[in-house]
Amino acid sequence: MYKYLPQSMYTMAAIKEASTVQENKSQAFVACPVTFVMEKVGGYWKPIILFNLLPGTKRYNELKRSIPTITEKVLIQQLKQLENDGLLIRKSKPVVPPYVTYELSKSGKALRPVLYAMAEWAVHNSGRQGKIFSKQMKDFPAE
């Protein structure tokens, strides 16, 4: 990439690039509210976690069982991000073994119609997969 630069310049270039990316990202949030929402709920696992919490409170192991392909590390990271973003509430009781539950916050529950609209869009715009999605919509929790 920087073939003729001294080694110290690689680090400076990486820092500059990272700060530019962060600045551009923050400008995108200001310019578009949808970008802000997608940053909070986007990605591969967050929508699945939110969907699984729509019916109500779940313990950590219940969540893990309902999303069998997610790793422990990723589930923990995603739960922390959702909690930090105010979309879910983590409650723990100081007992052995640990008793930890997760539930959607008021802000998280407000995403239900958004998630439903996204699921409906997928049914109508995903070709053959739409039939499978349509069957899954029957499991979509009511308000």
Give short role names for the model-derived ranges.
Residues 1-41:
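N-terminal leader segment of winged-helix/HTH proteins
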Residues 47, 85, 114-129:
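Alpha-helical linker/hinge and terminal dimerization helices associated
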